[in-house]
Amino acid sequence: MKHIISPLDLSLSELSDVLNLAEKIIVDPKQYSECCQGKKLATLFYEPSTRTRLSFEAAMLNLGGSVLGFSSADSSSAAKGESVADTIRVISSYADICAMRHPKEGAPLVASTYSSIPVINAGDGGHNHPTQTLTDLLTIKNLKGRLDNLTIGFCGDLKFGRTVHSLINAMVRYEGIKFVLISPEELKIPAYLREEVLDRGNIPYEEVKNLEAVMPELDILYMTRVQKERFFNEEDYIRLKDSFILDAKKMEGAKEDMLVLHPLPRVNEIATEIDNDPRAVYFKQAEFGVYARMALIMLLLNVVPQE
């Protein structure tokens, strides 16, 4: 049995399996509509979510399975003090696979040690978000045609942005990748990521504070919001929330085939005037999240149809 707590829990070969299957689903989703008949997905969401929770539910329903779970800690026995370990022990007897989101880093890892069913990390604090990474990789692969030889800019909250941390961990395994890290000083990527992943792996990167200046070199621009829920001091949030805003003027300097990604939700970091630019693919990215999760669920449950 395999748990997906980090993108690194999938080898490059396994990543390829997920992405290739997801692309087949994009072409003909109805072919897989009965793969999970009789199977149940438990969604244990201790933290608010729109896209991740609903796309997991849509994925399982599209596969012919069913879903049970909760959408906030307050609506579960966590509000009474029940531990993650006890919760997952019980849920393991109710479902065949589990997706967990939790505000505490490492909670899904704890759950996996007590679970008798596969656990998928649907986001743990500011740490990891592996299924968003699969969504991002699928979007890039499908729309750019490759996952190597890319210059990728990450802009905004790189300190608390778990989607950024996960995608960096995944992309460093491909050839010819360069990162441009665009953030205010207070929201730079964590030191462990810089030292243990980028520096140790000799991955080329630059840290800058001016988005417009680096736009011409980017193949991918990954925008993020400044996350109010990660700040202890509201004054710091207010001071930093408008640090980087992507608008039509900044897009003038970008390549014609650059892609703008965003894990969503956005607040004001991408002007709505960008939405109709063909390079803005964040809504397509959200759609691809369903297909990526369908593929992962099928592979973890070993229900992929034989060709």
Curated annotation (Swiss-Prot):
One of its GO terms (molecular function) is aspartate carbamoyltransferase activity. Its EC number is 2.1.3.2. GO terms for biological process: 'de novo' pyrimidine nucleobase biosynthetic process; 'de novo' UMP biosynthetic process; amino acid metabolic process. Pathway: Pyrimidine metabolism; UMP biosynthesis via de novo pathway; (S)-dihydroorotate from bicarbonate: step 2/3. Carbamoyl phosphate binds at residues 51-52, 101, 129, 132, 264-265. L-aspartate binds at residues 80, 162, 225. Transmembrane segments: none annotated. The keyword Transferase applies. SUPFAM superfamilies: Aspartate/ornithine carbamoyltransferase. It catalyses: carbamoyl phosphate + L-aspartate = N-carbamoyl-L-aspartate + phosphate + H(+). Keywords: Pyrimidine biosynthesis, Transferase. The keyword Transmembrane helix does not apply. Pfam families: OTCace (PF00185), OTCace_N (PF02729). Belongs to the aspartate/ornithine carbamoyltransferase superfamily. ATCase family. Heterododecamer (2C3:3R2) of six catalytic PyrB chains organized as two trimers (C3), and six regulatory PyrI chains organized as three dimers (R2). Catalyzes the condensation of carbamoyl phosphate and aspartate to form carbamoyl aspartate and inorganic phosphate, the committed step in the de novo pyrimidine nucleotide biosynthesis pathway. This is Aspartate carbamoyltransferase catalytic subunit. The lineage of its organism: Bacteria, Bacillati, Bacillota, Clostridia, Lachnospirales.
